[in-house]
Amino acid sequence: MQVGLSQDFYREKLYKKFGFKNAEELLKDWANDHAKNWDANNLLSKLQTWQLNDISKGPLYKNNYIKALKSIRAKTILMPCNQDLYFRTEDNKYENKFIPRSSLRPIDSSYGHCAANPGNDKNFEKQLDKNIKELLS
């Protein structure tokens, strides 16, 4: 279980679905899991990927982010979670303006950043399956 959950998750006490009596129990479990099971080097590598990931870097786009977005040719569906506190829907709205053949389909989920975790949100999974089928058809 991750801490990237929305305020609604805690208000709705959805942590009980995972067997926790209260939010504090959930957070302690998360901290223990990360301390015992996550290698610090893996976390540092993940952070570095987030910090350095930029499709506009390099000689082709010369740091022109909009030009890089406009070069995407694949049919694209952007599915941000409106309650994600890490990756905001506003960012995808901006990107959607420049990606040809893209559509923006935000999803509401109390699971926030964790909406896409398998088993968390059946509505998210249904929407994801529907959009994948559309992309592949």
Predicted regions and their residues:
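Alpha/beta-hydrolase
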Residues: 1-74, 86
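Short, well-ordered coil↔helix boundary/capping segments
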Residues: 37, 63-66, 82-89, 119-122, ...
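Active-site proximal loops enriched in glycine and acidic residues that flank catalytic Cys/His/Asp
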Residues: 47, 80-83, 106-109
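Conserved loop-alpha-helix segment in the C-terminal half of the alpha/beta-hydrolase fold
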Residues: 67-77, 81-103
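Catalytic active-site module of serine/aspartate enzymes centered on a nucleophile-bearing elbow/loop
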Residues: 93-137
